[in-house]
């Protein structure tokens, strides 16, 4: 028989740097999950992605066990890394803060494909291009 799901928690954490401090402690503590076990397992799984923010969906069961799925980093994080900028533009249509090439856009779309609701690379590129436009990043 399958275990009963008590809660599903979604949080974004820096890869390889989860600690029992907030936000992990405050998200998992009320459900009685072993926070150190989660942190250790998350850090092992995401060590190769150091420096990126990783969204994680944690499923908590009635026996206080858990399972989790890591997603791909948000498109905005990947775009900022590719453009070499700290943050997006406060006025995206007026003030451009960075540039990326079509090739970089394609690479980001390929990384994000498994989390996007499309199987077409061109459609994924258009979605990522929209995010870039709203951040003030120009595609050349």
From Swiss-Prot:
Annotated GO MF terms: large ribosomal subunit rRNA binding; structural constituent of ribosome
Species in which this protein is naturally found: Caldanaerobacter subterraneus subsp. tengcongensis (strain DSM 15242 / JCM 11007 / NBRC 100824 / MB4)
One Gene Ontology CC term in the entry: cytosolic large ribosomal subunit
Residue stretches in coiled coil: none
InterPro entries given in the database record: Ribosomal_uL11, Ribosomal_uL11_bac-typ, Ribosomal_uL11_C, Ribosomal_uL11_C_sf, Ribosomal_uL11_N, Ribosomal_uL11_N_sf
An annotated GO BP: translation
Name of the molecule in the record: Large ribosomal subunit protein uL11
Family: Belongs to the universal ribosomal protein uL11 family.
The protein's role, per its UniProt record: Forms part of the ribosomal stalk which helps the ribosome interact with GTP-bound translation factors.
